[in-house]
Amino acid sequence: MLTRRSLLRLGALAPLTLAARSAAAQTDDWKKVVDGARKEGKVVMYSGAVGNPMSPKIATAFEAKYGVRLELLEARASELRERVRTEQVSGRVLGDVSHNGSTTTSLQAAEGVFQPYGALPSAGRPVAPFKADALRVPVYVITWGMLVNTEMVKPADEPKSWQDLLAPRWKGQILADDMRALGGGAVFFMVTYQHLGREYHEKLARQQPHMNRELRGNYRRVARGEYPIFVPFTLADVLDLKDLPVKHVIPAEGCPYVRFDGAIFKGAPHPNAARLLMDFFLGDEVQGIYAAFGFRPVVGGLDGKAPAEARGILQAKLLGTTDAKLQDEMLKTATQIYK
């Protein structure tokens, strides 16, 4: 005969039993995804991170773990958007996964080119301010600061903040990525415009910065002493400049940043492999690869994966990021201010 105590005990065990069954079902469902991905044999990723060394390492790690080949196509964000539009209209979709900046990804999401990725075991891993939604998972973060020539600028004279660039000593001495075109310069303009105001940029324009679009060439120009400062500087790139008389500066206000996102294209020909790659993005292996190259992971606890000289970069204060809805307006405003 069941006593009241026995009934209460059974009632307490019921939720645990249901939870265990649910977890087992999820495990079985995910095993079907993994098995399906292996049958598909490959996944095609379209990436806007042209020439970065991380993607080939991720491809190698993915195939080693799952036996699924990752085929990589790299191109500029605008070129990828047009390619995807053409594929979607024609009904001949070749790409599976998008790997692109959050601004481009947001614009594409509004165009309806992605499909929900469903449940992923690792979807809850990102830490604030990064999080996944129904279409996108964050993958890694690019942060920007300043690059300074250590032979031309004494430690006491180094700019410590974005506001310090307005000091009279830097008039005509600042090399900058073009703020009037898509890229790091536009990110810097939008974020600092939002946080420091239009007046800040009007004053910075009077400093007569020399702007161009020769990103890595600009690093060398600063190292050669042609200019003492370059902004905005991709902080992770300092790891490639170890033997040169330059250093990075993390501004006191914080760093503009852009998040790279992963998403699955509508009609992806390898849907299981696409989901598997999306989950793989958020695992320690991939996040550790990004950290090792000085890029900020979107999950916690991986600072130790980075070289000692990059750990400060991974912990840098974040100022803000871009807003896809404001992109055209901000480019127009930058053109008005920086003539």
Predicted segment positions?
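N-terminal secretory signal peptides and thylakoid transit peptides that target proteins
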Residues: M1-A14
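Immediate post-signal peptide segment of exported/extracytoplasmic ligand-binding proteins
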Residues: A25-V44, E63-A64, A167-R169
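Extracytoplasmic ligand-binding site segments that recognize negatively charged/polar headgroups
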Residues: Y46-A59, E71-E226
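A ligand-binding cleft/hinge motif common to bilobed small-molecule-binding domains
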Residues: T103-L107, P228-P245
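Periplasmic-binding protein-like
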Residues: I142, W170-R180, E202-A205, M211-N212, K242-A268, F281-D303, ...
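A bilobed periplasmic-binding-protein/Venus flytrap-type ligand-binding module shared by bacterial periplasmic
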Residues: G145-M152, F189-M190, V258-H270, I289-Y290
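Extracellular/periplasmic bilobal clamshell ligand-binding domains
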Residues: G288, K305-K339
